[in-house]
């Protein structure tokens, strides 16, 4: 067996062993793949390897990149239904099978459930049988038997559309490698940084290492009999029998700075352990307490400013916040006022980007086939205020002032006020004409409008994007990707695609950007 398992606590040297293996494979021109959980990890390890001139032949990917490589080498050519199109299909099926409109959260959870059923190789018939048995044993309140029917309808719809989903394609590719192991070619694969491993990831590890016999290295932060690692015990128990080699690393305190070593090493060794002793922490662990959220953030900002003044690099400082409960806008305001350089990794809606806000506003200004427009004054202004759209941005401010004085709170009444003094807003008419021609035409026009909005402030300038413009580029990429998926859906199943500009605006508003 070609699977090498490396386990140990945090900071025990697992990364060092994995990267040494990457360097060794690269030196022998074996073209290794290093698989890490996040895009930030991809960029970090690419920089580290590039600094050592070890990037030739080395690929650093997220797990999705590994699956794409497996699909390519296995020769699985089925087209995949995009994530947004899949959600539209599931929403339609849920409405029919469950007799209720399902919200975005439910649809995402349903998509994840069906994906896990795929990776566990549970067919619709098997699910229906299990749910029926549950229903017979425990009564109507115990089982959601309609989920089995929904899964079966989903499978039938994919066949009708001539598409598969991501999990289905991945499982077919892994099955192809099991049948013909030589398709992989023997490239080494190394996993590092995963807190835990999902079923599909374990399946890929077993297929590559045990069936294909490719060199596979898996690093897992784990120690037996430690409370902090109890949640990973099941994953370890699945990996251990597959491993031909298992290296257990001992804890190492030298990773920590000398002045913090005693406290932080003790914290790592004692975390969640009952009856752990207390040690003096010195200045390694400090509590900052403010009279309110802003005061607390100001204390954090002052602490960071002190560290920067002492010569610490900004990229070596991390600030962790609660996913819910911390006002991100307040954090940005406080750090900006303190001149703290920072980047914020968070999910945000498509409309947070200037071009996303402008496009959704523009779409809401388009009259429905009935002739009614639900767009508000703010939607029209969001479009007109897109960077570069107006050579004189103050014209939008003037329109807002006149509209509010006239009581024109919707786009229908505000538009004539604009056109009394300025040019006709024909873009709205072009979108309405596209809407009348059908979903495909509407989506094509919306995609072009999004691109023009991105280009508006950059016309006649062959310039590189500044760092603060990368968010807009990300919004452009995400928006065009979503519109392309919807355009494909409009070609395959027009009844599932957004039929009106207003509906399309709602779909785009649900897109999340990550930075």
Predicted regions and their residues:
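Short, polar/flexible loop-turn hinges at active-site or ligand-entry regions and domain interfaces
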Residues: 28-30, 52-56, 73-82, 95-104, ...
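Conserved motor-region signature of P-loop NTPase helicases/translocases
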Residues: 1-47, 184-186, 190, 195-372
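Conserved P-loop NTPase-based nucleic-acid remodeling module centered on helicase motor cores
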Residues: 28-142, 152
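ATPase/helicase motor core of nucleic-acid motors
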Residues: 52-59, 66, 70, 96-98, ...
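Conserved helicase core region in the C-terminal RecA-like lobe
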Residues: 59-66, 188-197, 201, 323-325, ...
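Accessory N-terminal region flanking or inserted into the helicase ATPase core
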Residues: 2-5, 94-193, 200, 204, ...
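Accessory C-terminal helicase-associated subdomains
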Residues: 141, 145, 154-157, 281-284, ...
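Core structural elements
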Residues: 111-122, 176-177, 321-330, 387-388, ...
